[in-house]
């Protein structure tokens, strides 16, 4: 979380016994403070940007290219324990210290598989990443998109949400219930303003009844509303 206070960042690094920290220059002050404090086990600092004082991601990438095929093959042949600890996620910790959720690669892949069993995501779908990737649901949703071969676009901000959905012709959207409720309320506000509430509510009942009989006319019935959301949203 880029907005994490320094104290929580330090505590998380201590509790996780992290040895490597990847950061960007925006958080350089916090990194310098961590190095000076020497309260964590972090011994390797990797900067995502070019830096005279730290190893950069570009530098590591360059070294990897120079290592040669033999070194790459050795790395790729390393044994993987799918059920060993691979990820520690700290919860929000609103009432006390953040709880550390311990996950394995098996847990993560199982989540991706389960989501694909619940919802159909296809190659060619377009997703909009709205939740940050340090948000577990946001990160898992992105892994689902990669697994399915779907494209991912990025929202320009909450005020541009509807504009981006239309502009990018979004077909799949992973988000929290609160955001869906906000979109629904906004749609219903427009429906009431245009005097179409009774017509829409009747359409909802009719389409629900027909759906039970295996007839789906929702996209035709609510085309005008769906067009306001880009026309592709499922």
Residue map of PLM features:
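Residue-level detector of structured alpha->beta connecting loops
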Residues: 17, 39, 149, 169-170, ...
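Conserved pre-ATP/AMP-binding loop-to-beta segment of ANL
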Residues: 47, 52, 67-90, 97, ...
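Short hydrophobic/charged patches on amphipathic alpha-helices used for structural packing
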Residues: 10, 77, 89, 162, ...
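Conserved AMP-binding A3 loop
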Residues: 86-112
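Conserved S/T- and glycine-rich ATP-binding loop of Class I adenylate-forming
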Residues: 21, 85, 91-94, 127, ...
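Conserved acidic residues
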Residues: 10, 19, 43, 83, ...
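Conserved AMP-binding/adenylation subdomain of ANL enzymes
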Residues: 109-126, 133-224, 228
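Structural core segment of the AMP-binding/adenylate-forming
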Residues: 1-63
């Amino acid at each position: 979380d880029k907005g994490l206070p320094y104290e929580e960042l330090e505590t998380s690094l201590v509790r996780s016994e992290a040895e490597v920290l990847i950061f960007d220059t925006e958080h350089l002050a916090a990194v310098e403070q961590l190095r000076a404090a020497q309260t964590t086990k972090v011994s390797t600092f990797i900067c995502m940007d070019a830096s005279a004082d730290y190893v950069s991601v570009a530098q590591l990438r360059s070294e990897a290219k120079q290592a040669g095929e033999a070194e790459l093959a050795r790395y790729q042949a390393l044994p993987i324990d799918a059920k060993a600890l691979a990820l520690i996620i700290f919860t929000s910790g609103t009432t006390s210290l953040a709880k550390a959720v311990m996950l394995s690669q098996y847990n993560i892949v199982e989540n991706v598989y389960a989501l694909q069993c619940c919802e159909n995501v296809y190659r060619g779908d377009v997703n909009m990443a709205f939740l940050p990737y340090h948000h577990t649901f946001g990160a898992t949703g992105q892994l689902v998109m990669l697994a399915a071969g779907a494209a991912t676009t990025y929202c320009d901000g909450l005020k541009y949400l509807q504009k981006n959905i239309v502009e990018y012709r979004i077909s799949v959207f992973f988000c929290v219930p609160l955001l869906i409720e906000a979109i629904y309320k906004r749609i219903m506000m427009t429906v009431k303003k245009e005097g179409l509430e009774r017509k829409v509510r009747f359409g909802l009942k009719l389409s629900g009844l027909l759906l039970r009989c295996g007839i789906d006319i929702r996209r035709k019935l609510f085309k005008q509303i769906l067009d306001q959301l880009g026309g592709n949203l499922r």
